[in-house]
Every structure is written in structure tokens, then in C-alpha cells.
Amino acid sequence: MGSCISLQISCDQVLTRAYSCFFSLGNYIHKLKDNIVALEKAIEDLTATRDDVLRRVQMEEGKGLERLQQVQVWLKRVEIIRNQFYDLLSARNIEIQRLCFYSNCSTNLSSSYTYGQRVFLMIKEVENLNSNGFFEIVAAPAPKLEMRPIQPTIMGRETIFQRAWNRLMDDGVGTMGLYGMGGVGKTTLLTQIHNTLHDTKNGVDIVIWVVVSSDLQIHKIQEDIGEKLGFIGKEWNKKQESQKAVDILNCLSKKRFVLLLDDIWKKVDLTKIGIPSQTRENKCKVVFTTRSLDVCARMGVHDPMEVQCLSTNDAWELFQEKVGQISLGSHPDILELAKKVAGKCRGLPLALNVIGETMAGKRAVQEWHHAVDVLTSYAAEFSGMDDHILLILKYSYDNLNDKHVRSCFQYCALYPEDYSIKKYRLIDYWICEGFIDGNIGKERAVNQGYEILGTLVRACLLSEEGKNKLEVKMHDVVREMALWTLSDLGKNKERCIVQAGSGLRKVPKVEDWGAVRRLSLMNNGIEEISGSPECPELTTLFLQENKSLVHISGEFFRHMRKLVVLDLSENHQLDGLPEQISELVALRYLDLSHTNIEGLPACLQDLKTLIHLNLECMRRLGSIAGISKLSSLRTLGLRNSNIMLDVMSVKELHLLEHLEILTIDIVSTMVLEQMIDAGTLMNCMQEVSIRCLIYDQEQDTKLRLPTMDSLRSLTMWNCEISEIEIERLTWNTNPTSPCFFNLSQVIIHVCSSLKDLTWLLFAPNITYLMIEQLEQLQELISHAKATGVTEEEQQQLHKIIPFQKLQILHLSSLPELKSIYWISLSFPCLSGIYVERCPKLRKLPLDSKTGTVGKKFVLQYKETEWIESVEWKDEATKLHFLPSTKLVYILS
């Protein structure tokens, strides 16, 4: 029964579809004659409409106007459909002759059906085209490249404009990005480019300026471009984005255009807008400004031009221009005060303009003193600062989508003005503050920290500093913006008190200690800290770098139960901690490095939440007894302190089951062996200094290092060792897996029995290598050890190319050294080799292809006779490196 029902349904469906198909086919054939007549009538109407439109267009063009693009597109479509109509009409007689049975059938059903369908569809298309042919406006004034208003060229900006212009004129450049912090002058530079195009033309048909801003809307950009191209009216406005894109594409494809996009915050999809590709052949250009390097990359610009702040001299010239010579000369002291005010702007044109204009009418010296005071203490209160400067810079802060990234940015404002901040220190703070989840593991957390720093650098909120970019710096005006956001835009100034580097001698008075969440008094001259402030909300306390600080009273810490970060480092006179530090029950970060503290209070063991403890460079600290009670500890710094580790100390360290990072000095073979036996400790070591290892006569003087995955820095000094081996490996095992993957710095001094350092093959990421006073060292990498294995093992060794990341190689007082490596190496990152008192080193592992093209390289030496004795691989190598050699006095 079920099968019969199914069959019935299937038959019904087949019949229905067959009927529908036959009905459609019949209509196309049966009504063919009528449809041809209807099509002829529709074409006649369309032609009449076209003639009317053309007549109007010709009249307007006679007045000097230019037909609208939408009119031109419509006329083009009319011509296309008319041509298609005449092609279709040419087959009319043949198709009509095929009709039979009173036009109900055809002698060629397939041909008649196809022809009839084309006629029917063309009627609809012609009627639709005709209905769209009624334009309110058919022509408008031709678009002109109008000058954009701009201030006179700022002193010092001529060079970057010329660079930008030269790059724009390069036929190989299609898209150019200008990036920099807010207020630095990107829009001004783009305006200069626009106006220069107006003056010079340079064969450009049209220049289009669009302000994009943070609220990116494709349809808004299309409207701005469409208006410039003559696409206006209701019909254009009603079109979908994709239809507008086609119109823009068709129009711009016939022109040489320059599109200027100002202030973009995310990738602009040029294809969606309808912008043709920019090629060497069409010489079209797109130029944009942004505050983000990420945006440059997403726009396909991998070599953008940075617009930087003005130099000190150029900034002063701009500031003088804004203030005027009458005000500057109205009192003898004003000129010096004006230089201080200008200096607070740190070369940022936006700040120089706003503050300069504000001070233009100030002729009383007291007003200038007041300006310096306000800009030093709380710049947000300076007239015009919040609305015209900080608010503009705050857009960059608002564009940071993650709240933790915003908190990390604000944290940098706790440092003094123009201060270089170590990256690793910031990341340690952020982990302890909870901005980064420390539970994911130290390495992953640190990587996340570097990702956040990269985000802030690419957003032009921080800049990288130092040769190896290990530090960051915050522009002073950006810092003021960060402090402004920390104070809830000035509504709660005591929420975050920052008087870092202010020359304080004592803790400042605060009206409402209960509101304070972050307090930075670092880098001052505070001598004593006393009192008992009620700070129930305080989470961060920076007291480091108060080099005169001798004493902190116990009462000071009594009401800080939410304190998470306490930094007391580099208080060189501080000789003790109060017992009340145990009341900091939420403390996670404590830095006592570079202090004069002799002993840790026993109550320190009560800090059960502490995860980061830095005791490095505490020259008077004698013991870490009880350290094992800090059950949450993950990072412990002991390097360069006075602690003499013994067996009991190592046992205590071994009890720290959550320990991930350890920096330490090892001065005893017994302690070293004990730590090697406690393998988990070796895996935690990040920085290790091995000093004064002395072996008994019956002891093997080989140093067997275990694998240390976390090790980043290794220093060895004055050790009686004859050879360094990797404990897990010998030279006849597979060496292709690095044992010291993270090791980047190796310094070895006064180890007189070492003959080679072949173990360095297992440290592929070394960037800095210093070898000094190794009297018996003959080869850096031993040829015999590295090749004296089986053929299969040699093939494995050949996969290791040493020193691929090495940047600096320092060789000093190595009287027997003859070889660094037996063949030439590529050294792609090498920037310098320093050679002193290495008389037997005649050959260097260099050839004419060594080093990165364009990278600065210097070969420094102390003795002229040494460089004259060097045996270069060939003449090309000699010519390649001799210009880079430099005679210097190297201080060992």
C-alpha cells in the first residue's frame, strides 16, 4: 500500500512539471509574433527616450557642464541593447516560417523555444531600461581638483614630503601608507601631496580625497567617491553597494586617478568600493594615513613611511611662530620658560600648535611659570589640553579592543617622562597584575606579553628603544593621555597618583588615600617613608630608584591588603624590611634587587600568594632560609647576590614545586652536581653564572651540562674545567635537536684549561658571544669533534649551521686560538666581530657572501699587525670586508 502511494505522488509530480514546462514552451512559441511586435514597440519607445536624454545632455554640455556618469552608463546600456535587438531581428523571418499549427508548434522546437525566450526576456530588459531613463539632472559642473586649506609648511617637514612625493611618483608604487601617532602631522602631509598634485597635475585625471575615520562604512566612501565622479540623484542613491562598485570601477578604469584616504583605522576593501588595481601600466595610486602599522600590513603596504615628531630645533621654531615674538620678548625670563613649555610637547605638532596658540597672548612671566607648573604636575588641566589634544590621542586608546591591552598600555604611564622601560619587566608586572593569565605557563605568558607590546608599538602608542629593541618608551603627551584615562578623564585624579621623577624628598600628601589604586613615586629622592595611609584599594606601588631611601616604617604597609605589586628595587641605601610586610596578603610581585638589605624577615614566608620574588644584586644578603615556604613562587631571581648556595639551600629550592624561572650563581661543584641531580631546577634556570669552580685533583674536570630548555644567559668565570659536554649527548649521538634552544648570551672569562667550545653547536640562537682569557683555547668549534664520527652521524651534523642568529662576537686574550670554524659561514645577523690579542687567529670563517646585504658590519681590532696578517679566503672577501675594519682601543 505504501508503495502505491509513493508511486501516485511521483506520477503527480512528473505530470505537474511536464505541464509547466509545456505551458512555458507553448507561450514562447505561440506568442512569438505578438512578442516581436511588442519588442519593436519597446525599442521605439526606448530610442525616443534616448534621443530626449541626448538632446538635454548636448544642451548642458554646450553650457560647459559635464554629463553625469550614471547618464553615460545608461546611454551605453541603451546602445548595447539596441545592437542586441537588431541581431535578434535578423533571424525573425526564419523563426516565423518555422511556426506551424496556427503558431502552436514549430518544425524546430528547440530553436523556436530559444528564440522566443530571448524575445520575451529582451522586452522586459528594454522596458526596465526605458523606465530608468528619466533623469532629474543629466549634467553637472566638471569636477575640479580644488586646493585644500593647509598651514604653511612646518619647519623640518620638507624632507619627509620630498621622500613621500618621490615614492608616490615611482611607477612601481601603487599603494602608499603614511603612519604615525595621533597629531604628528599625517593629514598635513597628505594635504601637501593633494595640493602639489593640484599645482603640477603630473598627468593625473582626477584626485579624490576621502576622510574615512574609525567608523568605516563602505557606502559612505562610495558616496564621497561617487559625488566626485558625478554619480548623483535618486537612482544612484537607491543602488546596492555592489552596483555602485561596478559604476565606480567602470568610470575609474578609464582614468589615471589618485585616491587619498585620510585616517583609516582598519583595512579598507578597495575592491568592494570599486577601486581598480593600481599597476605600473595605469600609474594609478592610493595613499592613506593611519596610526596603525597593522593597518598598513593589511592594506598590503609592507614598507610604510613613518611620520615622526619634530626635532627639538624644528619644534622650537614652530612654537615661536605660534606664540609670536611680542609675547616671547615681553619679559627677559619668558624665553627660557617658553623653551620649557615647548619641551613638554616633545616635538608633537598638535601639542605645539594648541599650547603655542594658548600662550600667544600671555605676556606676564607669572603666567608662563604657571604653564610650566601645570604641564609638569597634571597637564590635562592645561587650557585646551583635554578637548584638543588628549581627546584626539584617546582615539588610539579606544581602538584597543581588549580591556587587558588597554590596562597594559596605561601601566606604562607609571614611569617617569621619557623613560626607557625594559620589556621583560613590564611583562612580569602584567602577569602578576592579572592582565596576562600566568596559569598558562611562563613561556606562553611571556609570548603573550610580547604580542601586547607589539600591538602597542604598531598602534604608535609606544616606541621601541635600544639596539636590540629590548625596551619601550612612551611619548610624553601620550603618557598624559594615559594618565587622563586612568583618572576617568580627570574626574577622579587620586585614583592613580604618578609623581615619578618629580624630585620628591618625601611622600606627597593625598586628600583621599581610599581612592588610590596605583601609586608611583619611583625615581625620586625620598629618604624615609612613614605614616599609616588608609589604602584599601591600592594594588600597585612603585617605590624603586629612590637612591636615598633608608627606612620604611611598618605602619606604612598596614592598610594595603589589596596590594599586588611592590617594587623596591634600586633603593641602594635601604637596609631592611619591616615585619608588617607580612600583612600584604594579596602581594604577588616583590622586587628587592639592588638594595642593601642584609636579611629577609622571617614573616616574608607568610606571603602565600607571592609568585615573583627578585633578590638579584643584593650584595649583603646572606641567606634565603625559609624560601620554600613561599608555596606559590614561580619566578625567583638570585643572580649576583651574596648568597652562597649550600646543600640545604638547594633542597629548599627543590621544594618550590611551582617554580618556573630561576636566575642563580653557582660557585661550588657540589652544589652544581646537586642541582643537576635535581633535574627540575635545571629546567627552571633562565640566567646562570658559574664562578670559581675548583676541582680536587682526583676529580674529572669535565663540566657536564644538562639540557636547560629555559636558559637564556650563561656566564662562566674563573673555572678550572677542561671541557664542556652536554650531559645527555655525546658526539656520536644525533645532535640535530638543540639542547639550549633559548640560550642567547654566552660569556666565558678566565677558564684557562678549555681547548674548544664545540658544545655551542647545540645552542642555535646565540646572539652575543664573548670569550676572554682562555689561554689554551685553540678552536671555537673543534673540527675533529664535529667530524670524527660515522658517515651517517656526519650527515646529521651537516644539518647544523652554527651562529645563524649571532650578532656580536667578542674574542679577547686568546693566545692559542687558531680557528673559529673550519669553513665559511653565512652569519646572516652578524653586525660586529671584535678581536684583541689573538695573534694566531689568521683565518676568519668569512667569504664575500657572508652577512646580510645592506646590514652594517664592523670588524674591530686592536693591533694593526693582526689585521695585516689575516689570510682572507680570496680577493673578493678581502675587498668585501676591509672597508668595514676599524682600529680601536677595546676595553676588555
Swiss-Prot record:
Amino acids binding ATP: 180-187
Example of a GO MF term: ADP binding
Domain NB-ARC: 137-440
Pfam families tied to this protein: LRR_14, NB-ARC, WH_DRP
InterPro entries referenced in this protein's UniProt entry, alphabetically: Apaf_helical (IPR042197), LRR_dom_sf (IPR032675), LRR_R13L4/SHOC2-like (IPR055414), NB-ARC (IPR002182), P-loop_NTPase (IPR027417), Plant_NBS-LRR (IPR050905), WH-like_DNA-bd_sf (IPR036388)
Keyword Coiled coil: yes
LRR repeats: 515-536, 537-559, 562-584, 586-608, 609-631, 632-654
UniProt domain comment: The LRR repeats probably act as specificity determinant of pathogen recognition.
Similarity-based family: Belongs to the disease resistance NB-LRR family.
UniProt-recorded name of the protein: Putative disease resistance protein At4g10780
Native organism: Arabidopsis thaliana
